[in-house]
């Protein structure tokens, strides 16, 4: 679609993993109205809401957030934000943060100071929304490739445990081991003899949506990498599990050694009976400040102890938002695309839904999740009907010929009898 100045691509065909041709047509028609409306909306949208992208505490670099932020910029104002200034002017840092409607925290790797936590806490108390994408275990495939396929998975302390506990959830220092997994590609051999092969990777769960909320409705599989388990706690805040591991999964404790060579005996289904572990949770309501009954590290002008009605989402995998980077062509790839297996996952759609919901843009969410039921032909009935017509086409002419022959014989005999 073009308005003369810019062109927007409209995706007409939705090719989901593991779907039949009939299901692909159903999904494509179901999303057609939204895709067309969304493209037209981009020509007329007037940005109002603002998203702060945390740029301190070792969060993901821009190159790995590129595709998601490119999409988000079409609807919202996007700006980097750092908490480094808390040490020199916490009051100003808080005021600057409160200019934003949403704070995105994508895979921090260094601990938060108590002062930084208080600023975020007061931002939430004043109605700010947060999308937490957090890793509680330090491990990556890149490290494994560099060390011959073996590495140690170590707990990662971000100094956020007490804060999360007060808000109603706990991120565990575990790795989700799931028999419903995605594959990774490893190289075998040296030099020109190198071969690439797909291997099962139980620490990359392929998560199917339970379709229990606007955020996760009509999604294809979402791929996570080294995800951690989430516990929800009773504190009066409404909680909705958006993503969870399969029934055939378990939580492996850390520290532990991770090896690319997975023993098939260790993948016995009998060992995977404690599944359905929460991996992404929506929390809504009035949150209690983590400093309600504690000594505050900062003396701010406002120190609210109970938040306005607000909401946040926590995902136990910082890599859910990370797009791959093509080093050969020096360009970021589309979020959710696995260049090694050429498969697409719905990470971007899930995060876009989460962002829309946190910012109260539910109209597009409703349209995106609109269900259209197509009346497909019943293949068995069609086959039976075809056979019936084939029989009729064969028998009717034959029957007509027999009738004509009988009538001809009858009239011929009658004519001869009259002559006699």
Task: Identify the role of each PLM range.
Residues 1-420:
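Short, surface-exposed patches at the edges or C-terminal ends of soluble domains, predominantly
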């Amino acid at each position: 679609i073009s308005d003369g100045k810019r062109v927007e691509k409209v995706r007409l065909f939705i090719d989901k993993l593991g779907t039949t041709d009939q299901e692909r047509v159903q999904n494509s028609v179901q999303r057609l109205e939204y895709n067309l409306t969304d493209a037209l909306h981009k020509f007329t949208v007037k940005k109002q809401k603002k998203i702060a992208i945390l740029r301190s505490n070792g969060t993901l670099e821009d190159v790995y957030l590129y595709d998601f932020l490119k999409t988000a910029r079409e609807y919202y104002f996007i700006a980097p934000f750092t908490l480094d200034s808390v040490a020199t002017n916490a009051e100003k840092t808080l005021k600057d943060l409160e200019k934003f409607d949403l704070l995105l925290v994508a895979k921090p790797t260094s601990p938060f100071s108590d002062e930084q936590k208080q600023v975020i806490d007061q931002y939430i108390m004043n109605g700010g929304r947060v999308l937490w994408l957090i890793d509680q275990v330090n491990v990556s495939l890149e490290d494994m490739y560099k060390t011959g396929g073996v590495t140690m998975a170590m707990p990662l302390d971000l100094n956020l445990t007490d804060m999360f506990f007060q808000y109603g959830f706990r991120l565990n220092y575990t790795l989700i081991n799931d028999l419903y997994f995605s594959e990774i590609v490893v190289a075998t051999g040296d030099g020109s003899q190198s071969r690439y092969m797909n291997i099962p990777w139980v620490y990359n769960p392929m998560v199917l949506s339970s379709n229990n909320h606007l955020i996760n409705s009509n999604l294809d599989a979402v791929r996570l990498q080294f995800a951690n388990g989430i516990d929800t706690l009773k504190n009066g805040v409404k909680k909705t599990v958006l993503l969870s591991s399969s029934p055939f999964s378990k939580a492996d404790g850390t520290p532990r050694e991770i090896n690319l060579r997975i023993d098939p005996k260790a993948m016995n289904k009998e060992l995977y009976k404690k599944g359905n572990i929460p991996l992404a949770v929506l929390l809504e309501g009035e949150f209690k400040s983590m400093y309600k009954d504690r000594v505050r590290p900062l003396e701010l002008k406002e120190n609210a102890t109970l938040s306005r009605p607000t909401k946040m989402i926590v995902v136990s995998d910082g890599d859910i938002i990370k797009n791959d980077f093509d080093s050969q062509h020096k360009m970021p790839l589309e979020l959710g695309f696995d260049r090694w297996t050429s498969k697409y996952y719905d990470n971007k759609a899930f995060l876009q839904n989460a962002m829309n919901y946190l910012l109260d843009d539910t109209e597009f969410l409703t349209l995106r999740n609109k269900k259209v039921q197509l009346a497909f032909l019943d293949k068995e009935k069609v086959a039976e009907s075809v056979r019936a017509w084939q029989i009729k086409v064969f028998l009717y002419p034959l029957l007509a010929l027999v009738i004509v022959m009988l009538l001809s014989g009858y009239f011929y005999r009658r004519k001869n009898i009259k002559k006699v």
